[in-house]
């Protein structure tokens, strides 16, 4: 009888131990989360904030705390952007945070006109302070390191696109990546076209920025680029309305009036011949390619169509252009656009 009792006790103990082992295994190495969760750990975050954001989504919180203490996570977690996937275990989550196994984020740069806008756009998508990024963009030293003369010229290095970065990328890392993208863009057969056009990279980018602000119609961009190339070659001021808006920093200006044309600025192409000192926006790749493959014609004027369809009427003579301009102005008046 005693032997049977002892045997039962041993079996019960074995079952309990096995159950405990299985439970422990499941808690540490089993599925700890039921849905995907993105975790952003900033450089300023403390361990408590990290754990507090994770705990509500964890099935095995005690196991997480125990394993995190065992690995010293409190003193050594890495900042970054982490994606906690369904099916991940406590062990995998803790190790991910300790080793800094980040998931890159997608950073989109588009429709940017000024360094201030660019720094704000970057700061919204990466763990970078706006003021710190703007300081880098305005640094003459950084401009020279990137191969440019001035911070204004440095702005021509940035190309609109979507890039992958680690969320914790520093301003310096961001700049080096953008320089590589810039060199890659131009080395893809575009430098050869530059030589044929007689423009430098900076000049082509600056002209492309004007073309981009004039139209979003990619099929019309080469023709508009051709107008400006003709004006440059003939020594005629570009008289580009978007440069007035940039000079005045009034990007919502809907109608350029005579009083605006005298605004004192090196970016005002009504009072200054040639190109502005630097781009007036971040032009699209299509606008850059339109400058490199500009349409050869003899137009030197263009004016928005009164149909407001985004396209333009082109002219070879001032009288033709004035007729187009009067038709457009009449439509502006009819629509009460001032």
Regions found by a protein language model. Give the residues of each.
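His/Glu-based metal-binding/catalytic segments typifying zinc-dependent metallopeptidases
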Residues: 260-272
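Active-site-proximal loop/helix segment associated with metal-binding centers of metalloenzymes
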Residues: 302
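Conserved catalytic or metal-liganding residues and their short signature motifs at active sites
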Residues: 1-239, 244-249, 265, 281-286, ...
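Short acidic/His-enriched helical or mixed secondary-structure segments at domain edges of catalytic enzymes
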Residues: 250-257
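Mature, solvent-exposed C-terminal subdomains and processed small-chain segments of exported/organellar
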Residues: 237-238, 272, 277
